[in-house]
């Protein structure tokens, strides 16, 4: 199992990962899509979550505008819209990734989502 933390050089990380960190990026919104199950594909894409970011105020990586998580399942969390991204941890368990996002609020909270693969939009 690999564990990757933004801002820490922790060895081999997925090419799409924002290694320098998104601290203080603003979450503009979260969109979800469901797709028809395609039985002809070996690993069909069933759904997608898009996390839209304004990273202009982020301390390190200001280029990320959106993160797409495919075949996702939310494990824990509340509404991310309007929150500032404080830190994250990306884990790999078997053939899935788990992204834990810590966002400040009344009490810092954890948003955790499992997914198969991701794409990151950068400006």
Predicted regions and their residues:
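Surface-exposed, interaction-prone regions used to assemble/regulate multi-protein complexes
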Residues: 1-123
